[in-house]
Amino acid sequence: MKIAIYPGSFDPVTNGHIDIIQRGRHLFDKIIVSILLNPGKKALFSLDERLDMLTESLKDIDGVEVDSFAGLLIDYAERKNAKAILRGMRAVSDFEYEFQMALMNRRLNRDIQTVFLMTGMRWIYTSSSIIKEAATFGGDISGMVPAIVEKKLEEKIGYVVNHKKAED
């Protein structure tokens, strides 16, 4: 079985993340979507909230497991018998960091490959940080996040749309 790990903070999960997962399923038998516990990052949502949002958002996609981990990604991938790390790239600006991480992971374990998928054009500008900022100021984020995320943002920060949606 070809298993890939798709790591991230998913604070919150976006439709761009889901696009990468759906396309990754064409390449792998199983994708483990795993939240990295990073004490250096201040998350808006708790680990449990992020796990719940991911589980709800991915419930209709077969071959996907939701999990979390702390420590080195490559060690986690070994424990899960994964042969690949799946990463999405939005723009050239993502490349340098992702390339360095891929090289380090390859140095630590040559048997685990990093596979990059370019984000679909529809999601190229989307990131969890931008979503949170837009929601904070009442920007319309519908269609950019799963319904459960929109609901949780409303509960967490009082997200209410106060701007008209622009045409795509």
Swiss-Prot record:
It catalyses: (R)-4'-phosphopantetheine + ATP + H(+) = 3'-dephospho-CoA + diphosphate. GO terms for molecular function: ATP binding; pantetheine-phosphate adenylyltransferase activity. The keyword Cytoplasm applies. Its cofactor is Mg(2+). Substrate binds at S9, K41, L73, R87. It holds the Pfam family CTP_transf_like. Its main location: cytoplasm. Its EC number is 2.7.7.3. ATP binds at S9, F10, H17, G88, M89, R90, E98, W123, I124, Y125, T126, S127, S128, S129. The record marks H17 as: Transition state stabilizer. InterPro entries: Cyt_trans-like, PPAT, Rossmann-like_a/b/a_fold. GO terms for biological process: coenzyme A biosynthetic process. Keywords: ATP-binding, Coenzyme A biosynthesis, Cytoplasm, Magnesium, Nucleotide-binding, Nucleotidyltransferase, Transferase. One of its GO terms (cellular component) is cytoplasm. Gene3D superfamilies: HUPs. Pathway: Cofactor biosynthesis; coenzyme A biosynthesis; CoA from (R)-pantothenate: step 4/5. It is found in: Cytoplasm. Disulfide bonds: none annotated. Homohexamer. Reversibly transfers an adenylyl group from ATP to 4'-phosphopantetheine, yielding dephospho-CoA (dPCoA) and pyrophosphate. Belongs to the bacterial CoaD family. This is Phosphopantetheine adenylyltransferase. The lineage of its organism: Bacteria, Pseudomonadati, Thermodesulfobacteriota, Desulfobacteria, Desulfobacterales.
